[in-house]
């Protein structure tokens, strides 16, 4: 009976991916580090970009927002590819940059999903009730996450790059099982501190989401014929991660 209030707490949480605040912080940091000309565009069309984030969230919980690596189910992986190609085509076709900004907002949300362990694996059925708790925890602790930029991939290709993204994020999922059921009983994020496994996973997922988005922004802008000369200084000469705070 002691576990009933805990379960009720989980059930009371809204069903989301990363929260809107989390999505915005990831996107804003990536825009700040992206191609300067693209940054000017997205600053000018910030309302449209944010509307894109909101649109992407509208069908959250559907197969469009997950790709479970082991079972190969869900459309998130394919949707990232399709949105990337569509945006490049729109820029080439001289579509309104307001519309492009909106689609980039949608794509930004999808990249954040790809860096969420709960969107890349579902093989521990016990964790279903912890999904939204972890995402709320991510938002609460986000101000304490350093932004570690892992660099631009000089050989960036969306397909192979995001294969690695999904494989990496999926490896964090067992750590969620370990954290939420440490000691054999269900816990909540109220039990976690900044030395916890959950904090470490959340922090790393944040930095990888920013890094992935910066890489994708540079790729899109380059493929669309934009100026990406700033890419040279975004690469670490010795391959080490860069602290971007």
How does the language model describe each region?
Residues 4-12:
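Sec-dependent N-terminal signal peptides
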Residues 16-102, 120-245:
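N-terminal, motif-rich segments that launch catalysis or mediate targeting to/interaction with membranes
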Residues 100-108, 112:
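Short alpha-helix carrying the canonical HExxH Zn2+-binding catalytic motif
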Residues 111-120:
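Secretory-pathway/luminal and periplasmic proteins that interact with or process carbohydrate-rich
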């Amino acid at each position: 009976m002691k576990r009933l209030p805990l379960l009720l707490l989980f059930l009371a949480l809204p069903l989301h991916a990363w929260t809107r605040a989390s999505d915005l912080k990831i996107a804003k940091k990536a825009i700040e580090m992206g191609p300067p000309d693209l940054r000017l565009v997205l600053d000018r069309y910030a309302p449209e970009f944010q509307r894109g984030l909101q649109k992407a969230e509208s069908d959250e919980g559907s197969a469009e927002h997950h790709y479970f690596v082991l079972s190969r189910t869900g459309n998130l992986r394919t949707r990232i590819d399709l949105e990337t190609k569509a945006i490049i085509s729109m820029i080439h076709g001289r579509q309104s940059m307001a519309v492009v900004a909106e689609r980039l907002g949608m794509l930004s949300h999808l990249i954040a999903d790809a860096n969420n362990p709960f969107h890349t694996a579902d093989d521990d059925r016990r964790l279903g009730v912890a999904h939204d708790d972890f995402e709320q925890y991510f938002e609460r602790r986000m101000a304490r996450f350093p932004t570690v930029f892992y660099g631009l991939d000089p050989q960036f290709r969306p397909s192979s790059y995001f294969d690695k993204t999904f494989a990496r994020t999926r490896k964090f999922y067992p750590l969620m099982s370990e954290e939420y059921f440490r000691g054999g009983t269900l816990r909540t994020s109220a039990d976690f501190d900044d030395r916890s496994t959950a904090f470490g996973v959340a922090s790393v997922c944040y930095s990888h989401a920013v890094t992935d988005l910066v890489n994708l922004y540079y790729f899109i802008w380059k493929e669309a014929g934009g100026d990406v000369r700033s890419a040279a200084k975004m690469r670490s000469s010795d391959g080490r991660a860069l602290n971007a705070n």
